[in-house]
Amino acid sequence: MADVTQAPEAQRQPASATTGEASASTKTWGAPAPVIVPSEPQESNEASNRDDDDADSSLGYDTASTTASLSSSIMDYRTIHGRTYHSEKHGTAYWGPNDERQNEALDISHHVLTLLLDGKLHGAPLNKNIQKVLDVGTGTGIWAVDFADEYPGAQVIGTDLSPIQPYWIPPNCKFEIDDAELPWTWPEGTFDYIHIRYLLGSISDWPQLFKQAFAALKPGGYVESFEPDASFESDDGSVTPDSPLTRWAQMNREGGKMSGKPFTIYSDNLQVQGMQEAGFTDITVKNFKIPVGPWPADPKLSEIGQYEQYAIEQDIEGTMMFMWDLVIQKPIEEMRLFAMSARKEMRKPTVHAYIPQRLVYARKPEA
């Protein structure tokens, strides 16, 4: 069994605050520029493709095997209560909206995690000369763009189910449409680093995800996974069992069971277990408590909490909507009232809520 290290950073934060995102059908896509921590990207050059022998423009699409059929219907969005979601065709339904409101929330969450890591984009000890990077479930692409800016010598590829990424990107960054749950078509030993973040409720087989990442990595390469728990907690009992925050988390966990795509990655320790099963070594774990709201006395944690609350409130209804229809199955008007109650609860200065989160990185053994 691989050694697991509890990183010392996981113990630095006070108990009241913090302790402690595959490859196939390719196409670069467009969306509004990020709203938080914006970079100054340039128009992308023609990007190199996976096998270096079939052209792939940074503003166009081509296809590859296995998941290539995704490309024919990527814009065939489904609409739920006026919000757009990724197409259900090909069995790749995802619970989050893919419209501008939700995307802004995702970008704010990126800012939260960057603040949490003291301005860093990763926890793994990466070489500055890193060459090829994969961002699985890239979302708006903000992490991939920022990473490409910070590591101009690296080729950064972000993959997602929805084409919501920006057109204007650094020349060393590109985006591809892909379902990470389908067999990966990357040749073995392609990447130096694979970044996986906030895929809760979207992966049915976490061990398989890490096995595919293991195969796609070069010997000595790193995989990194950052996932929140599906819960709102408090150390002083201010988040009660009947709180709307608690009931919201319970709804998500139940929805994960019903869909077969768990929200319990943190509580079930799926990151560490999956990495161990895949064959990774030097597994390092960092646990965090991200405050919800500005309640912590520590200025940095208070700022993080403000942004976290802003991220949640930015699209609280959109974040609830899919699971509400799946689990609760009551009129949408009731969901909106429930969202109001959750928002009100978060804003109470006496509620000291936080969300447990876990960053895990590990290395593929040298050949």
Question: Where do the language-model regions lie?
Answer:
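Conserved alpha-helix/loop element of class I SAM-dependent methyltransferases that forms part
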Residues: 97-132, 142, 146
